[in-house]
Amino acid sequence: MTSRTPTTVPCLLGPTASGKTAAALALAARHPVEIISVDSALVYREMDIGTAKPTAEERAVAPHHLIDIVDPTDSYSAAQFRADTLRLTGEIHARGRLPLLVGGTMLYYKALTQGLNDLPAADADLRATLDADAAREGWPAMHARLAAVDPVTAARLAPNDSQRIQRALEVFMLTGQAMSALLAAPARVDDAAAAWRFVPVALEPSDRGVLHARIEKRFDAMLANGFVDEVVKLRERGDLSPEMPSMRCVGYRQVWEYLDGAVDYSTMRDKGVFATRQLCKRQLTWLRSMTERVVVDCCDPHATARVLEAIEALL
């Protein structure tokens, strides 16, 4: 039996504020594109302003997938993303249309293209126990507990990073092995992605200062457009907490802190900008590890045209 040549699927990746949406919509104006979002914040409903979610007008240009698919009380894993994206890619291709992956959540992209490690699924009862321990002892104490069983993971986590500390402890308690050891093991091999050749086209800045200025301008625009009110409404639901993955999204945790009275407005704004820049830095580090990527300078005034050229050369 002869193996079929994998079908190329372009993936437009880049840090926040690099111009991905504009380039994707420009491609959609020229090709029958359906966009698959690669963004862990856009999956949440009721979180529009702080996630810079594509507008209704933008989403009318081309079908968008994996946006507004879960409630902020829920979580959405890299494993779910991989399964959904492989399914959607096949469905879009079968319709005779072009799947285009767009986003900046590099953990999702890595799971899609490199497979998944054998980490156990979340255990609600165990998490409740860990939450109760943390409420009694504090997260720094939980961090110390993690350091005793998985010093490698503990060394890269802040003592108040409740979400990741909880997950690392959960993995150890379920498997008896350190999460760092499980992640270092070879990813599980499967053939689910074998039909596709995912090719990253990366929007990266030749001048990081230009991107930082865009980030600052965009965060200020979010605040002007009602970001604080959006978080007020989320808090008023009564079923969300700052420890949930949705409320740990960049910007939301800083506004939540402001609404708690822990910081003033100016400090909240500065912390939000700083956190977004730190996210950008992490995204660029991921991108630069992808030696196979096609790079487009997002500072180039003709960046959108360069992206179109790069993607159309793949088709």
From Swiss-Prot:
<feature type="site" description="Interaction with substrate tRNA">
    <location>
        <position position="127"/>
    </location>
</feature>
<protein>
    <recommendedName>
        <fullName>tRNA dimethylallyltransferase</fullName>
        <ecNumber>2.5.1.75</ecNumber>
    </recommendedName>
</protein>
<dbReference type="GO" id="GO:0006400">
    <property type="term" value="P:tRNA modification"/>
</dbReference>
<feature type="site" description="Interaction with substrate tRNA">
    <location>
        <position position="105"/>
    </location>
</feature>
<feature type="binding site">
    <location>
        <begin position="16"/>
        <end position="21"/>
    </location>
    <ligand>
        <name>substrate</name>
    </ligand>
</feature>
<keyword id="KW-0460">Magnesium</keyword>
<dbReference type="Pfam" id="PF01715">
    <property type="entry name" value="IPPT"/>
</dbReference>
<keyword id="KW-0808">Transferase</keyword>
<feature type="region of interest" description="Interaction with substrate tRNA">
    <location>
        <begin position="39"/>
        <end position="42"/>
    </location>
</feature>
<comment type="similarity">
    <text>Belongs to the IPP transferase family.</text>
</comment>
<dbReference type="GO" id="GO:0005524">
    <property type="term" value="F:ATP binding"/>
</dbReference>
<dbReference type="InterPro" id="IPR039657">
    <property type="entry name" value="Dimethylallyltransferase"/>
</dbReference>
<dbReference type="InterPro" id="IPR027417">
    <property type="entry name" value="P-loop_NTPase"/>
</dbReference>
<feature type="region of interest" description="Interaction with substrate tRNA">
    <location>
        <begin position="248"/>
        <end position="253"/>
    </location>
</feature>
<comment type="subunit">
    <text>Monomer.</text>
</comment>
<keyword id="KW-0067">ATP-binding</keyword>
<keyword id="KW-0547">Nucleotide-binding</keyword>
<dbReference type="InterPro" id="IPR018022">
    <property type="entry name" value="IPT"/>
</dbReference>
<comment type="function">
    <text>Catalyzes the transfer of a dimethylallyl group onto the adenine at position 37 in tRNAs that read codons beginning with uridine, leading to the formation of N6-(dimethylallyl)adenosine (i(6)A).</text>
</comment>
<dbReference type="GO" id="GO:0052381">
    <property type="term" value="F:tRNA dimethylallyltransferase activity"/>
</dbReference>
<feature type="region of interest" description="Interaction with substrate tRNA">
    <location>
        <begin position="163"/>
        <end position="167"/>
    </location>
</feature>
<feature type="binding site">
    <location>
        <begin position="14"/>
        <end position="21"/>
    </location>
    <ligand>
        <name>ATP</name>
    </ligand>
</feature>
<keyword id="KW-0819">tRNA processing</keyword>
